[in-house]
């Protein structure tokens, strides 16, 4: 039997008993209690270099940075192997995979039995959210992957201090992770152990996460999507708060007024770029600061305002497409102490990925560790960087404020070649929830005259809601109604809700809106709408700006171009609203009646409008 040997700084009997229980099941060769120290980090990095999991990069160009190359079969989240095992199938809903918890436990017990043989079990304590914040939650991950242990040190507040907050009886979310490849005595390990059979399992009632077979990102760093979205969304519903797939940014105008915005976009729609936006020419005196680029936990305050924290402490960003033009702040964040995964590397130890530079460097080794061949991808399309958020030059002074930052507006956006205008403001909270619930994003780049397939991704939470999506909509509606009463009593208002679409195309299939820093122009209008300063025109689908309502200083973007990305085609909108029925039917009878009513009213308004 493996000796548990809990260190003195762990004073939580229930936690120690749980570690012992999992050790008896998984049978690791030894147990290490992580303390989050620099010495421990370096020791684990050196261990992985010796194992061939990691390589040291050029320390002049990339100080303190390392590269890991995963197994080619283990490169992304596995949505089809991700389960929400609630007691009742209906509580998981139609958009999640479900299995009876008793059946799943039996299955996983078989898989986890002896799964850590020959390996070290790392006990990784972490806080999602600033230590001690009333919005934060603690997790403990038991993993046999040193890659997970070092990555969690960057992605969460990881180490000894977590045990001080936990004390002798504090609550924690138990997370168990194994790569699922036990080692027999004397057997040589592979550089990236993983198992073809994978399970990422959540038990919402008992707040447990079990992950088997993958060493990669969101499947293995269990504080990220598993805890911070799937389990936290269940907690939020029970306790009256929100766990959302949203960036948080701060906007300060030249007069010193500051607003915080939370924005939800599906993957590959530019969340990180938007969170780290640099205002363009013509916006001197404006400042954008980053609180978070991926996840927001939002709790109502006594004053009826919604306060958000970024539960993470790092960025786990997609590398391809990131460069000094698209995201200079992100590139500056990567100046040191980065763990790269599945990017390419030059013969002198510098990283490279598609979009980093126009020229492909000579003598490149691709993400599979082979010489790069032109015409193939050098970096995997989902190649990642893991880096501490505190290194970001645009990081907000209040990014670790335990009370959170007050949200003035929510933005929802997807990738649509037509139909959806550049920006629109919802009529009210219910209308905003309807728009977020029915938002869609194209899965394929739209060819000329051919629309990409629109996948509905409600609130950009389709892969991440830990319970029935219809109940999730209901939670947003109820929270709005409750908070609205408090807000009115304190002289505050609910955040306004906006929809954006940076991706409208012209007849030739080209993007019309320049995006990136130019999105500041839309952001300014949104802020001014929150302040009651900006004009808008009422249309059947929401309030929209005219060309004159936006600030065009420093750009030559024409009224004709603006009209192209803001026009509302009546037939397209009738088709669009009618297509929402497919999602609503899928979600079944728990769908809030208010959303069905909103759909009928919208459809009628659009049909009555002149084109």
From Swiss-Prot:
Cofactor binding note from Swiss-Prot or TrEMBL: Binds 1 Mn(2+) ion per subunit.
Compartments where found: Cytoplasm
GO molecular function terms attached to this record: GTP binding; manganese ion binding; phosphoenolpyruvate carboxykinase (GTP) activity
Active site: 269
EC numbers, comma separated: 4.1.1.32
Matches recorded under CDD domains: PEPCK_GTP (cd00819)
Any single Gene Ontology cellular-component annotation: cytosol
Residues annotated for substrate binding in this entry: 77, 216-218, 267, 382-384
Pathway: Carbohydrate biosynthesis; gluconeogenesis
Cofactor: Mn(2+)
Residue positions binding GTP: 268-273, 384, 415, 516-519
Family: Belongs to the phosphoenolpyruvate carboxykinase [GTP] family.
Function in brief: Catalyzes the conversion of oxaloacetate (OAA) to phosphoenolpyruvate (PEP), the rate-limiting step in the metabolic pathway that produces glucose from lactate and other precursors derived from the citric acid cycle.
Record-given protein name: Phosphoenolpyruvate carboxykinase [GTP]
Gene label: pckG
């Amino acid at each position: 039997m493996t000796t548990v040997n809990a260190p003195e700084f762990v004073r939580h009997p229930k936690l120690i008993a749980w570690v012992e229980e999992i050790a008896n099941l998984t049978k690791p060769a030894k147990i290490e209690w992580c303390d989050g120290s620099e010495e421990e980090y370096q020791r684990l990095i050196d261990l992985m270099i010796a194992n061939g999991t990691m390589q040291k990069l050029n320390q002049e160009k990339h100080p303190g940075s390392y590269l890991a190359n995963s197994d080619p079969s283990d490169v992304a989240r596995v949505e089809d192997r991700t389960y929400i095992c609630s007691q009742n199938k209906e509580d998981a809903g139609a958009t999640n995979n479900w299995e009876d918890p008793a059946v799943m436990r039996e299955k996983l017990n078989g898989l986890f039995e002896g799964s850590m043989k020959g390996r070290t079990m790392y006990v990784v304590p972490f806080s999602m959210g600033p230590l001690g914040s009333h919005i934060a939650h603690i997790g403990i991950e038991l993993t046999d992957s040193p890659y997970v242990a070092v990555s969690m040190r960057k992605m969460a507040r990881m180490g000894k201090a977590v045990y001080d907050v936990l004390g002798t009886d504090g609550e924690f979310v138990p997370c168990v992770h194994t790569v699922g490849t036990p080692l027999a005595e004397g057997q040589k390990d592979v550089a990236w152990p993983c198992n073809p059979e994978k399970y990422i399992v959540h038990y919402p009632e008992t707040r447990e996460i079990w992950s088997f077979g993958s060493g990669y990102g969101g499947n293995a760093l269990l504080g990220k999507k598993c805890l911070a979205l799937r389990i936290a969304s269940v907690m939020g519903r029970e306790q009256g708060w929100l766990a959302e797939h949203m960036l948080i940014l701060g906007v300060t105008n030249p007069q010193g007024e500051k607003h915080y915005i939370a924005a939800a976009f599906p993957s590959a729609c530019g969340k990180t770029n938007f969170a780290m936006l640099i205002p363009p020419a013509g916006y001197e005196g404006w400042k954008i600061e980053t609180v978070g680029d991926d996840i927001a936990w939002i709790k109502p305050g006594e004053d009826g305002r919604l306060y958000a924290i970024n539960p993470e402490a790092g960025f786990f960003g997609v590398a391809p497409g990131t460069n000094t033009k698209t995201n200079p702040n992100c590139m500056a964040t990567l100046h040191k102490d980065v763990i790269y995964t599945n990017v390419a590397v030059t013969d002198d130890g510098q990283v490279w990925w598609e979009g980093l530079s126009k020229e492909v460097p000579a003598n490149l080794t691709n993400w599979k560790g082979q010489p790069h061949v032109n015409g193939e991808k050098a970096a995997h399309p989902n190649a990642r960087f893991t880096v501490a958020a505190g290194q970001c030059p645009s990081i907000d002074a209040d990014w670790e404020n335990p009370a959170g930052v007050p949200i003035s507006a929510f933005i929802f956006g997807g990738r649509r070649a037509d139909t959806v205008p550049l920006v629109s403001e919802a009529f009210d909270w219910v209308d905003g929830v309807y728009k977020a619930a029915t938002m869609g994003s194209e899965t394929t780049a739209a060819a000329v005259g051919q629309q990409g397939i629109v996948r509905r991704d409600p609130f950009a939470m389709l892969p991440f809601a830990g319970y029935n999506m219809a109940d999730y909509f209901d939670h947003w509606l109820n929270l709005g109604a409750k908070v609205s009463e408090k807000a009115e009593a304190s002289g505050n208002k609910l955040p306004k809700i906006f929809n954006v679409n940076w991706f409208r195309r012209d007849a030739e299939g080209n993007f019309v809106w320049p995006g990136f820093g130019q999105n500041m122009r839309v952001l300014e209008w949104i802020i001014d709408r929150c302040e009651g300063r900006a004009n808008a025109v009422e249309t059947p689908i929401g309030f929209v700006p005219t060309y004159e309502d936006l600030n065009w200083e420093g750009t030559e973007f024409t009224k004709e171009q603006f009209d192209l990305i803001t026009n509302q085609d009546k037939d397209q909108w009738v088709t669009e609203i009618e297509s929402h029925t497919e999602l609503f039917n899928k979600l079944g009878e728990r769908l809030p009646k208010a959303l069905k009513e909103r759909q009928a009213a919208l459809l009628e308004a659009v049909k009555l409008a002149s084109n």
